[in-house]
Amino acid sequence: VSDAVTLLAALGGSLSAFYFQRYQVQDSQDKTQIDTLRQTQFFLISQYDRLIDINRQHFAQWKDDEQAWCSMPALLPMSYKELQVDFGKLFFLLNKNAENLLLLQIAQQSFFAALEAFNGRSEFHISHFQPRIGLLEEQNVEFKDYEDFKTKIGKRVFKTLEMATSDCFMHIEGSIRKLREASRSLHALSKEIYPNEKFSLIKDAE
């Protein structure tokens, strides 16, 4: 009887240790996933805030101006690679909601495409438009009207900068919308997985 009791006690202790260890592993995994979800939201919110600031300070005043292509100044180069979402850490969401991951990927592609559009326009503005203006000023060229100005700037410079400016407006509006959608979708999924945890999300700021 004594041996049986000892065996049962040992077995009970082993089972307790097993379940405790499994609890610790699960608890550690949950903490990692919660931190990843919160960090991802932080990146989405930060990207959104950057675009809102850029739009307010730079784009909004030129939105309905047909001369925005030449009047809107160039921006300083932007990267924000430090705000890039790490999708490797979000792999666990595949079994939860693959659609959410797709929304996140679309939002990320849109954000960095917007930055690329801003940088591309600014580079062309600095490398081609500004030198052309400088040359015309050196030659004391006068402009009769807006149409004359476009003609003397040159068709290639005008068309390229006009299209690049239009792309900037399109990208910033689309990216703001997609980041908002991705953030709200991720927030809903995060609360579904961890209902007792708190998660941030993008709030309207336009």
Task: Name each model-derived stretch.
Residues 1-28:
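Membrane-embedded hydrophobic alpha-helical segments
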Residues 23-45:
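Juxtamembrane membrane-water interface segments immediately C-terminal to a transmembrane helix
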Residues 41, 45-206:
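Interfacial alpha-helical end/capping and short helix-turn segments at domain and membrane boundaries
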